[in-house]
Amino acid sequence: MTVNLQAKNSQFKMSPVSANEKYLVFDLESDGLYDKVTKVHCIVIHDIGSNQTFSYGPDCIADAIAHLATADVLIGHNIIFYDIPVLNKLYSFTTTSEIIDTLICTRLIWPKEKLYELDLEQYPEVPPNLRGSASLKTW
């Protein structure tokens, strides 16, 4: 059984993934950071229930947004602070879907310092610039 980890009032609760809900994992590629973004180049959406992946190019972003609007749960990496705000800024996208942001999950489970320590201890061959949190600074 797959589980969904949710933080409510700083406490974690495990709940089963519901077969009755539509879970969409998505990512987008754009032309810049939030302050300077002017265009979304593409959006890829994976429907967990149907196990189908959909790719939307620059001429089909409206279709991708309509697809995202069908979700009960949206999942992605840094979607709270980047992807969803970019879609709102450029296309007036809003959602009432539950959000699972894997960047937030990662930081809750492994604080930056702990990630660095784990990388150093378990993977000493990993170059220092690739250790630690998944941030621009890391890369």
Task: Give, region by region, the residue ranges found by the protein language model.
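Conserved Rossmann-like nucleotide-cofactor binding loop
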Residues: 31
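Conserved DEDDh/DEDDy metal-dependent 3′-5′ exonuclease domain
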Residues: 4, 13-16, 21-26, 34-35, ...
